[in-house]
C-alpha cells in the first residue's frame, strides 16, 4: 500500500469538509481515489483497495465488549489500570488498547505521530456522546512520543507508559488482522523503539510496559513479563520506582 495521498468524500455535501481536512493534512482532494482518507456522512474512514472501510471507534457500543476482552488480557495485568492512574499510550495506532485501559478507570492519553491515524482517532473521539466523555478518560495528542516526552516536566510524568512498537515480524504472520496489516504498511517499522523505551524509563513514575511478539527477543531485558498466546507484555521498572 502506498502512502495516503488524498482525501475523498461520499457526496458533494461533504466536499467542503473533505477539502478542509485535505488542506490540514497537506493531501490532495480526490473523490475517485481508491486509497485515501474517506469522509462519509457518519464518520471519517480509511479507504483501501480490497478492504472494507476502516475507522477508529470509541463509541459506547464498544466499551462493554472491550472491557470484557480486557479482563482476559495480559494488558490489564501488566498495566494495572485503576481510577486515577495516568497512562500514556505512546504508540496509539487504532486506539484499541488505549480504549481497553480507559474502561478500567485509568486516565489515558494517546500519542500518535502519523497524521492520517491521528485524524482517524480525532474523529472517533469527536463522535462520543457526553455520557461517554464523562465516563471514560481518553484523550489524544498528535505528536511523536519521543518529542513529547522530552517536553514533559517531571511533575507531569505519567504513572505508566505503554508502548506497542511496529516490528517486521507482524508482516510475516497470516494471523495478523486487517487493521494491523494496514497500520503496518501505512506506518512501517518503528526503528526508534529502543530509544523510546530508554527515554520512557526516565520519564515515568511506576513502570513501562512494552507489547512484543511472544517468540521474539526483547529489545531490552525486562524486569518481568506476562505471556499471552502470540504476544507478551514486558515490564520495565525505573530505578527510582518503589512500586
From Swiss-Prot:
It is an enzyme of class 2 (transferase). Keywords: Cytoplasm, Methyltransferase, rRNA processing, S-adenosyl-L-methionine, Transferase. S-adenosyl-L-methionine binds at residues 112-113, 164. GO terms for molecular function: rRNA (guanine-N2-)-methyltransferase activity. It catalyses: guanosine(1516) in 16S rRNA + S-adenosyl-L-methionine = N(2)-methylguanosine(1516) in 16S rRNA + S-adenosyl-L-homocysteine + H(+). InterPro entries: 16SrRNA_methylTrfase_J, SAM-dependent_MTases_sf. It is found in: Cytoplasm. It comes from the Bacteria. Pfam families: SAM_MT. Its EC number is 2.1.1.242. GO terms for cellular component: cytoplasm. Signal peptide: none annotated. PANTHER family: RIBOSOMAL RNA SMALL SUBUNIT METHYLTRANSFERASE J. Belongs to the methyltransferase superfamily. RsmJ family. Specifically methylates the guanosine in position 1516 of 16S rRNA. This is Ribosomal RNA small subunit methyltransferase J. The lineage of its organism: Bacteria, Pseudomonadati, Pseudomonadota, Gammaproteobacteria, Legionellales.
Amino acid at each position: 500500500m502506498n502512502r495516503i495521498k488524498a482525501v475523498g468524500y461520499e457526496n458533494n455535501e461533504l466536499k467542503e469538509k473533505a477539502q478542509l481536512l485535505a488542506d490540514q493534512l497537506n493531501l490532495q482532494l480526490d473523490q475517485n481515489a481508491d486509497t485515501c482518507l474517506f469522509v462519509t456522512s457518519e464518520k471519517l474512514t480509511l479507504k483501501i483497495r480490497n478492504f472494507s472501510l476502516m475507522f477508529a471507534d470509541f463509541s459506547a457500543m464498544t466499551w462493554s465488549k472491550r472491557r470484557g476482552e480486557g479482563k482476559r488480557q495480559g494488558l490489564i495485568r501488566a498495566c494495572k489500570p485503576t481510577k486515577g492512574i495516568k497512562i500514556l499510550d505512546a504508540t496509539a495506532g487504532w486506539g484499541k488498547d488505549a480504549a481497553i485501559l480507559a474502561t478500567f478507570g485509568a486516565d489515558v492519553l494517546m500519542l500518535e505521530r502519523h497524521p492520517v491515524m491521528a485524524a482517524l482517532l480525532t474523529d472517533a473521539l469527536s463522535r462520543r456522546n457526553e455520557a461517554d466523555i464523562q465516563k471514560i478518560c481518553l484523550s489524544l495528542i498528535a505528536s511523536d512520543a519521543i518529542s513529547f516526552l522530552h517536553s514533559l516536566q517531571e511533575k507531569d510524568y505519567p504513572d505508566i507508559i505503554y508502548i506497542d512498537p511496529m516490528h517486521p515480524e507482524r508482516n510475516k504472520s497470516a494471523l495478523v488482522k486487517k487493521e494491523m496489516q494496514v497500520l503496518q504498511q501505512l506506518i512501517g517499522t518503528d526503528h526508534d523503539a529502543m530509544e523510546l523505551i530508554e527515554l520512557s524509563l526516565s520519564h515515568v513514575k511506576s513502570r513501562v510496559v512494552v507489547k512484543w511478539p511472544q517468540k521474539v527477543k526483547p529489545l531490552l531485558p525486562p524486569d518481568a513479563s506476562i505471556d499471552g498466546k502470540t504476544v507478551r507484555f514486558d515490564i520495565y521498572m525505573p530505578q527510582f520506582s518503589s512500586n
